[in-house]
């Protein structure tokens, strides 16, 4: 089956609201896409910042890759103040943070997300009916003015990537202890991580046959 291939930048609505039909990935408002695929009727006039790149055949989607380009001066804004995991209190009070997150802590935290996990803590309630997802790759790179988070998975739940980013940054600022990280896939986080800013998130690649 042939799909239309699109590029778009920070749309002012979820892409499925702007162009109705079957999308391979239903990205949120302000989330950009280097490539996304659509099956259906294309409107005569495309929304602003949405570009049709062509057509490609798709038999099966193997995985999706997202990249989050986090400016260093926006890192603190992505923090989630996490209080409990299960019955364990991980932070009694808010702490003042400054500077940049610890890159080594963030990289170590990212390793724990690889594999088939229960991502109930990283989505909204209505998406938690089937919370099992497999993360194939999760890398973090430091550039001069920003960090690049690259995450590849077989599927992603609603808001999942943005909540993961907020959580990882919180680990980098020592808000959430690394020693309790595996519990987030077994016990309930209270509160759940907030959604990191969608403007820095890109759907980067659809791996397909």
Swiss-Prot record:
Catalytic activity: uridine(38/39/40) in tRNA = pseudouridine(38/39/40) in tRNA
Gene Ontology CC terms, in alphabetical order: cytoplasm
Alphabetical GO biological process terms: mRNA pseudouridine synthesis; tRNA pseudouridine synthesis
Assigned keywords, A-Z: Isomerase, tRNA processing
Source domain of life: Archaea
Molecular function GO labels: RNA binding; tRNA pseudouridine(38-40) synthase activity
EC number of the protein: 5.4.99.12
The protein's enzyme class: isomerase
Catalytic center residues: 28 (nucleophile)
InterPro entries in alphabetical order: PsdUridine_synth_cat_dom_sf (IPR020103), PsdUridine_synth_TruA (IPR001406), PsdUridine_synth_TruA_a/b_dom (IPR020097), PsdUridine_synth_TruA_C (IPR020095)
Keyword Metal-binding listed: no
Function: Formation of pseudouridine at positions 38, 39 and 40 in the anticodon stem and loop of transfer RNAs.
Classification via PANTHER family: PSEUDOURIDYLATE SYNTHASE, TRNA PSEUDOURIDINE(38_39) SYNTHASE
Protein family according to the UniProt entry: Belongs to the tRNA pseudouridine synthase TruA family.
Protein name as it appears in the record: tRNA pseudouridine synthase A
Organism: Nanoarchaeum equitans (strain Kin4-M)
Lineage: Archaea, Nanobdellota, Candidatus Nanoarchaeia, Nanoarchaeales, Nanoarchaeaceae
Encoding gene (name): truA
């Amino acid at each position: 089956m042939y799909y239309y291939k699109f590029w778009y930048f920070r749309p002012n609505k979820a892409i499925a609201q702007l162009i109705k039909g079957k999308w391979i990935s239903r990205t949120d408002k302000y989330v950009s896409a280097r490539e996304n695929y659509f099956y259906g009727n294309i409107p005569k006039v495309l929304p602003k910042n949405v570009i049709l790149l062509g057509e490609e055949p798709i038999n099966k989607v193997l995985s999706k890759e997202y990249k989050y380009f986090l400016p260093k001066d926006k890192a603190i804004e992505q923090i989630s103040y996490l209080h409990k995991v299960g019955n364990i209190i991980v932070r009694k009070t808010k702490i003042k943070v400054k500077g940049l997150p610890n890159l080594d802590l963030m990289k170590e935290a990212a390793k724990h997300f690889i594999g088939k996990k229960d991502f109930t803590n990283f989505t909204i309630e209505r998406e938690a009916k089937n919370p099992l997802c497999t993360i194939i790759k999760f890398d973090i790179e430091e550039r001069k003015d920003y960090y690049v988070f690259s995450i590849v998975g077989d599927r992603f739940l609603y808001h999942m990537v943005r909540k993961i980013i907020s959580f990882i940054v919180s680990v980098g600022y020592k808000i959430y202890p690394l020693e309790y990280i595996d519990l987030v896939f077994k016990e309930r986080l209270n509160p759940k991580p907030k959604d990191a800013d969608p403007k820095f998130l890109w759907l980067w690649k659809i791996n397909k046959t």
